[in-house]
Amino acid sequence: MAHPRGELGQLDVPLTPLAPPPLAPQPRLAPLPRLAPLKRFSRLKALLPVGLNLLLAAAFSLPSPAPARQKPPVQPRIGVWLTNSPSPLYYDPARLDQAVADLADSGFTTLYPNVWSRGTTFHRSRHAPMEPALAKANPNLDPICRMTRQAQRRGMEVIPWFEYGLMEPGQAAIVSEKPEWVLQRRDGSTAYPMHGQTMVWLNPAHPGVRERFIGLILEVVQRCGVDGIQLDDHFAWPVELGYDPYTRQLYRTETGREPPDNHLDRYWMKWRRQQLTSLLRELRQRLRDFDATPAKGGRTPRRERVISLSPGPFRFAYNRWLQDWELWSVGELVDDLIVQNYAYSVKGFAKDLDQPALVKAKGWGMPVEIGILAGFGGRTPDMATLREKVLLATGRGHGVIYFYWEGLWGLHAGPEGGAARRAAFRRLHQEIRSGLPGSR
């Protein structure tokens, strides 16, 4: 990883204001695929066919309905992102085991290991090549499965992080093998400068892309028995893309019109945003189908896996990356929201906790954690500053997720050093757990 998460907004392509809505009648968008009704809306849907007279009669003849069943309160997480770069963690079994033991001892409840980066995986996959350094060092290590076993027996959860989402390096084999999967700009270009590399973006609307992406996720869930999966700001559709032959034809088929030349046309944006949401709905359903089947040799279904999302700020995500994470959250397409807040000063951090989307998210009945920079490169806050930030977040009922592992007490721990910071994190987590209903 070239820089801290949350700097995705610093792009070569500027964000320009949205175009005003056209006056001409707009195409009717195709409906999303029909799936099982979502829990929050199933009761309402069941009432819609009932005639008005029946409803009025029932209102006077039946007792008041019981209030809607509320989900049990979910306790805040104390988690950390783990990556391979820059860190030797994934390549050494003894180091990996010790890291998990130290994290458990220090009060962590959830681990978010990077499992998909730069077109390669950190597990044996039939959909993509293994990360070259891991394949060279120890192709049989399978660090995600090993980490999961070690963490779960210590009472922690493991939620692998699919960091690169739908991005691929421009030179990846899949790009040359399946050029029809790649999104294009209106001028036909595909290159997307990102993290100092030339990347391309695979098409969320293409059936082949969808099957491969969901397959990457399901094989980790099935093989390693993880507790969920995480998507982030790379699970997106960049707003200037979508003029490739496949997307043009799909838009014509569904709307009877050509894609507008203006990539900021709001109805064109809405249609593409809908395609991305459709992919997430399909992933949600496939995970539910998997979890509903009995475990091998067992009689009971598996528990439902968590879909965690760590997006950028809402307005930027909605307009630039076509991510509607408010809809995804309210519609139960995601279960856990981690809002990145990497402001270096305590004052800036506190201000960002008051952003409207974050305040609104607290009312959605789902856990909302705050991503906090523990240390990366030359940016390592001292423990006093970190403590202030953590207590600000947990004081408002949020959990905290640190970026990243080596910034806790490892390579990027700063001048305070490893042993002192590890002891300080242990004390801090004991302190915040004593002030919360609990943690998970």
Regions found by a protein language model. Name each.
Residues Q75-I78, S85-Y90, G165-E219, R223:
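Active-site-adjacent "subsite" loops/lids of carbohydrate-active enzymes
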Residues L82-Y90, H127-N140, G196-E211, D265-Q275, ...:
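The substrate-binding groove and active-site-proximal loops of carbohydrate-active enzymes
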Residues P88-S106, P132-Q152, R212, Q274-E282:
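Aromatic- and glycine-enriched glycan-recognition loops and surfaces
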Residues R95-T120, C224, R396-G399:
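Catalytic domains of carbohydrate-active enzymes, especially glycoside hydrolases
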Residues F108-L141:
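Aromatic-lined carbohydrate-binding/catalytic grooves of carbohydrate-active enzymes
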Residues R124-A135, L166-H195, D233-P260:
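Aromatic- and acidic-residue-enriched segments that line the glycan-binding/catalytic groove
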Residues Y251-P294, G298-R379:
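Glycoside hydrolase catalytic-domain groove-lining segments
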Residues D335-F349, W364-R440:
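Substrate-binding cleft of secreted/luminal carbohydrate-active enzymes
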